[in-house]
Design a protein with these regions (language model features):
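Short, surface-exposed linear patches
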Residues: 26-30, 35-36, 142-143, 166-167, ...
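Polysaccharide-binding and catalytic clefts of secreted carbohydrate-active enzymes
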Residues: 1-107
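C-terminal beta-sandwich/jelly-roll accessory domains of carbohydrate-active enzymes
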Residues: 256-276, 282-353
Length: 353
């Protein structure tokens, strides 16, 4: 079954900010197309876009070419279509990354010129996973992550991608090579040299036992499909992730309590600190994720004096129904946490006023 079509992969111009061939120079000398600039007739690319003119020029022409392909394809079979983007990063000069591709600052041009493209999808190898997702979902745009890092942090990024940004799909690069029992691998000297020239984080392409963690993340998400779609996009669903090593935690305001989530120290060979929370009632929630210490607190300003955890359960979803495993008590309930291997817990609590 074909679900959607990738029209182009990381399209753009490498090595320079734009095409300087004779035909390209002639096109660049012409005014900006009226479709892009209805307010100032006859204005040049440089007058309108100044120093970013070369990249905007390339973005327009790449997007027009993609639109020709996509619109013709949809006439034959109207499937959803997407284009994925090689993202800009330091030193952030067009040509170091593919100039004119659908990076965030070019999307306004792409959306005008390539109306048949349904999704502009970021390939996220950068460490700022949250920032990229936020840019690509601006204005309610749908998110698809066709390529992501290969290291273990990708297994934790799954949860905020679905919980916060409602991604339609998530796949690390080369997922067909991932196995739960696959050993860690190192990059060759040639690979390291190429990544260095392209200013790409070497760790993003290092497989460090990711398979067993990612398999568990996918297993949890698959088992939670029913409850996920029930609460997707509502105030009862929350997500979180540690954005950098200086961030110690976060506090989420739930319906009946505040949830203090402290980020645990972890090695580079483990997933990061991230998770998803689904409130199935005012005094009950599920939390799935990794490397997080959990503390339930009274809601400030609510008049709550004390909060009691009634139960803390391990378990799993089977056919959409929660099947309780162990009921945790004693030290396990006192030290509430998610470990390095993705897991799910259910909490029931009672607030006293």
């Amino acid at each position: 079954t074909v679900l959607m079509v990738q029209v182009e992969n990381e399209i753009g111009f490498l090595g320079a900010d734009r095409d300087y061939s004779v035909p390209a120079e002639e096109a660049f000398a012409k005014p900006v197309p009226q479709k892009l600039n209805s307010e100032f007739a006859g204005i040049s690319w440089e007058q309108l876009y100044q120093e970013t003119a070369p990249e905007m020029f390339m973005a327009w022409h790449y997007a027009c070419a993609v639109e020709e392909i996509a619109s013709a394809g949809k006439e034959e079979y109207p499937l959803p279509m997407y284009v994925n983007a090689w993202l800009n990063q330091f030193p952030d000069r067009p040509g170091n990354y593919p100039s004119g591709g659908p990076i965030a600052r070019n999307l306004s041009i792409w959306r005008i010129a390539a109306e048949s493209i349904d999704i502009f999808a970021p390939d996220i190898y950068l460490s700022d996973f949250d920032g990229v997702c936020r840019e690509y979902t601006a204005g309610g745009a749908p998110l698809l992550i066709p390529e992501a890092r290969r290291d273990a942090v990708t297994a934790s990024n799954v949860f905020p991608a679905f919980a916060i940004y409602h991604t339609l799909g998530f796949s690390p690069f080369g997922i067909e090579d991932f196995r739960a029992d696959k050993e860690e691998e190192e990059l060759s000297a040639t690979d390291q040299e190429v990544l260095e020239k392209l200013q790409i984080d070497e760790l993003a392409f290092v497989y460090n036992g990711t398979g067993r963690f990612l398999a568990r993340s996918y297993e949890l998400m698959d088992s939670m499909k029913k409850i996920y779609f029930q609460y997707r996009g509502t105030d009862s669903m929350h997500g979180y992730l540690q954005k950098n090593e200086h961030e110690k935690g976060t506090i989420l305001r739930l319906a009946g309590c505040e949830l203090e989530l402290s980020y645990r120290k972890h090695s580079l060979s483990e997933p990061g600190c991230a998770g998803m929370i689904i409130e199935d009632s005012e005094e009950s929630f599920f939390i799935a994720g990794c490397n997080t210490d959990i503390r339930l607190l009274p809601r400030r300003g609510s008049g709550q004096k004390h909060l009691t955890v009634l139960s803390m359960e391990e378990g799993s979803f089977e056919n959409g129904q929660w099947r309780r495993g162990r009921m945790l008590n004693g030290d396990e309930r006192y030290h509430k946490r998610l470990g390095s291997v993705p897991e799910i817990l259910r909490f029931r609590y009672k607030a006293e006023r």
